[in-house]
Regions:
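N-terminal, positively charged, Ser/Thr/Ala/Gly-biased leader segments
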Residues: 40-44, 48
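Conserved small/polar residues in nucleotide/adenosyl-binding loops
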Residues: 232-239
């Protein structure tokens, strides 16, 4: 019985890994296709469409705004969660954030202030977490397309190589716990964007943004396996 149970448990694990690998391969190809297209519209519809195109046939809810509230235990927060948008307010919040950004003028900003503003906007859109899964990958693709409209020659390599840091930086930009002296900060996502846009060499290490050492179990891990590319080769975590 133990051998049989062990066999089927192993088979289940293998099947899950194969499914996740298949998902990553499919999403990777779709990302490349979307980024190769010289098209873009700055709107919530574009953002939602990117999600649909990335995950159609993978998630039943591809391109659909979630209708339930969510929490996600985060390794970088010692198992705590970011407060995501309520399901009832997602579309209105998306519309508001996009309208605010559309009406914002970068004309008189120096590049440093522009990067800070972009970091805040992208962090805000991600915090809404419009979908059940796939929010970070959707946000990454949208960000690349958006930054290209400013004339920046943005590739997907940095997002691929630092995919886990990118997500953790977005988490830190949206988490406050004043009782523990933790404040939301965009400094980490700004460091990522400065490397991306200005070719700086800021060190992007997950341990640098960990709120404190954690032994909490069942939270998203920052192990080497999670450092692999969310956009291309690693579908876990599925955001």
């Amino acid at each position: 019985k133990q051998l049989i149970d062990s066999y089927y448990e192993s088979k289940t694990v293998r099947a899950d890994i194969e499914d996740r690998t298949e998902e990553a391969d499919k999403v990777s190809a779709r990302i490349a296709e979307i980024l190769s297209e010289k098209t873009f519209t700055f709107s919530p519809i574009e953002y939602i469409t990117i999600h649909r195109r990335l995950f159609q046939g993978i998630y039943k809810f591809a391109g659909k705004i979630r209708d339930y509230n969510i929490t996600k235990k985060e390794w970088v927060l010692k198992g705590e969660t970011v407060l995501y948008a309520s399901a009832d307010s997602i579309r209105e919040t998306l519309d508001y954030d996009f309208m605010q950004e559309k009406n914002f003028s970068y004309k008189d900003l120096n590049i440093n202030d522009a990067i800070t503003h972009i970091a805040k906007f992208i962090s805000g859109v991600w915090q809404i977490h419009a979908f059940g899964e796939g929010n970070t990958r959707t946000t990454a693709v949208f960000t690349i397309k958006y930054l290209r409209t400013f004339g920046f020659d943005i590739s997907n390599e940095a997002f691929a190589y630092h995919s886990w840091y990118f997500r953790n930086a977005l988490v830190r930009a949206n988490y406050n716990n004043l009782s523990k002296g933790i404040y939301a900060t965009t400094e980490y996502i700004e460091a990522f964007f400065r490397n991306l846009i200005l070719s700086e060499h800021n060190e992007l290490k997950n341990r640098m943004i960990l709120v404190q050492e954690s032994s909490t179990k069942n939270v998203q891990s920052a192990s080497a396996s999670n450092e692999t590319c969310l956009l291309y080769t690693s579908p876990s975590p599925r955001d």
